[in-house]
A protein has these predicted regions:
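Polar, enzyme-active/binding microenvironments
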Residues: 1-182
Length: 182
């Protein structure tokens, strides 16, 4: 296997290489027993969330960032997702877009309250369904840019859209990337 199930860490206040200790069951693995390929990450600074996974999964796991150990079950996504884009503030984490093997690129945005476990809820929709999209956020907005789709026809997007994380609703178009990319 060229991928493993391990959590790699490096203290954020120090320079150096990650500690590649063998903590079991993680997030970025593929291969015969892969669970997490293209997961989406969110954090409130204390808790880190991992959403989605290989072949369109509904995984929703978390870790406590300040300690080592295995991930724990947080809940489930509403739909199975691979290669979505993650945004968060100190309260909410959301995943937008993505795909699963049986459907075209998704426009769905799902969210959770980071401090409490539970299943994801519907936030709204992206302006364009796509996967492999970039995502950034601050304390008020979550933005998704670019991305691609494969079904029914392949495309690459230059769309940039955003949501206000404090309230639910559909994303708004806020411009375009200089070129379409994923």
């Amino acid at each position: 296997d060229k991928y493993s199930k391990s959590i790699d860490m490096a203290p954020l206040r120090s320079l150096g290489n990650p500690d590649f200790s063998p903590y079991d069951d993680v997030f970025c693995s593929t291969g015969a027993d892969a669970e997490y390929v293209y997961p989406t990450f969110q954090s409130n600074g204390e808790r880190g969330l991992f959403m989605g996974g290989n072949n369109g999964e509904n995984y929703l796991d978390y870790i406590t960032i300040s300690s080592t150990g295995n991930a724990s079950d947080f809940g489930n996504l509403q739909t199975d997702i691979t290669a979505g884009g993650g945004v968060s503030n100190k309260v909410r984490g959301a995943i937008g877009g993505g795909f699963n093997p049986s459907t075209m690129a998704q426009n769905v945005i799902q969210y959770v309250t980071i401090a409490t476990t539970g299943n994801a809820q519907d936030f709204g929709d992206l302006t364009v369904g796509r996967d492999r999209l970039g995502a950034v956020s601050n304390l008020s907005r979550g933005c998704w840019g670019g991305g691609s789709g494969r079904n029914p026809g392949a495309f690459t997007s230059n769309t940039v859209d955003y949501v206000t994380l404090a309230s639910t609703g559909n994303a708004q178009d806020c411009g375009d990337l200089t070129v379409a990319r994923e």
